[in-house]
Amino acid sequence: DSYVEPFTDAGANLITVHQETCPHLHRTVQHIKSAGCQTGVAINPATSVDLLYPILPDVDLVLVMSVNPGFGGQSFIESSYEKIYKLDAIREQLNLNYLIEVDGGVTSNNATQLIRKGADVLVAGSSVFKSGDIESAIGDLTSKMNAGRADMG
């Protein structure tokens, strides 16, 4: 909570907090909203989506960490697909509008499947910046994301 004002004073329009670091997640989300920012909540790979259920109507974004936070270049954790699918199903069932973002191990090899499962935003670090050809890597990733969207009709 003590970081909200410094971020908003710096011009932030979206603040994402980790569920695991907030003992009073609802209070933190409401604090962010009252400061005029959109709110996001992130979950680590071992955290169940079920823990977010009470807060989902209040957030603008859910960030699924698909690697353990801390350093780049880790492999995508396969159980993240089920989390994305479940978050998308809840969003549909409750007619909510939060975005689903995925960060960690995102590559052109899994981008299509991530979009098909319900992801809206993909964060690709190492797969782009360590590719040797950033422009080509971004183009390939974008193409795979668009293929996933086309598959969804």
Label the model's feature ranges.
Residues 14, 39, 121-122, 128:
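A short hydrophobic/small-residue beta-strand
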Residues 105-117:
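Acidic, divalent-metal-coordinating active-site segment for phosphoryl/phosphodiester hydrolysis
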Residues 68-70, 105-108, 128-129:
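Short Gly/Pro-enriched loop/turn and capping motifs at secondary-structure junctions
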Residues 7, 62, 87, 103, ...:
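Conserved, mostly hydrophobic/aromatic
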Residues 10-12, 118-119:
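As written
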Residues 32, 115, 129-153:
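C-terminal helical cap(s) of enzyme catalytic domains, especially alpha/beta-barrels
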Residues 2-6, 12-99:
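Conserved anion-binding
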Residues 23, 27, 93, 107, ...:
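Expand to "…catalyze enediolate/carbanion chemistry for C-C bond making/breaking, isomerization
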